Amino acid sequence: DLDEANDASEIEVNPVMITGDRDVVAADAVMNIDEDALFRQPDLAEMAEESYEDDLERKAGEYGFDYVRLSGNVGIIGNGAGLVMTTLDLVDHYGGSPANFLDIGGGAKAERVTQALDMVFSDPNVDSVVFNIFGGITRGDEVAKGINEALAEFDEIPKPVVVRLAGTNAAEGMEILNTDLIEVEETLEDAVQRAVRNAEEVTQ
């Protein structure tokens, strides 16, 4: 089997999309290899080294994030591939240009949220950031704590950040967020539109 032959701990096709012509397309596929078994997979180990296009993608791999660097200037962080894809599509819909796909995954703790923001802030192409979290496993108050911790690392916020929290403990998260440093929107549409405007203002 594919997983046993390659020492894979996970094989996933996600997301699957339906095109306007009703064709089904596997938009992304991921195979995670057990790092402790790479000595048995020299070809895969070499491919892993070659697959990193830059330091950000290498760092994302170390953090365990699903990350793809794009050519735009609006940084996108979310929890869940579908949610991030929706945010990416809305950025494009409202006239912006996505800078990345960054999925922090379910149940992300404050440390991982801090790592995600640090990554996006480190991208010189990013002019603004939209952070979209729908709480389930990932609690809104935990995410808010992580955002505040990340922001505390900077003497001044390097790029404008718009946050949208919904779902589990979202109200508590909204109260925790330092709104002196970031902007908060209740709906995803409003958050994306503000992030796109922020990016436009930076580039003017």
Pin down the residues of each PLM region.
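Short Gly/Thr/Asp-enriched flexible loops that form oxyanion-binding sites at enzyme active sites
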Residues: R139-A150
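Glycine-rich, proline-tolerant flexible connector loops at the mouths of alpha/beta enzymes
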Residues: F134-T138
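Short, acidic/small-residue loops that bind anionic groups at enzyme active sites
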Residues: A150-G167, E185
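ATP-dependent carboxylate/acyl-activation modules
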Residues: D1-V13, M17-F131, V143, A166-Q204
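Short basic/hydrophobic patches in alpha-helices and adjacent helix-turn junctions
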Residues: M119-S122, E149-E153
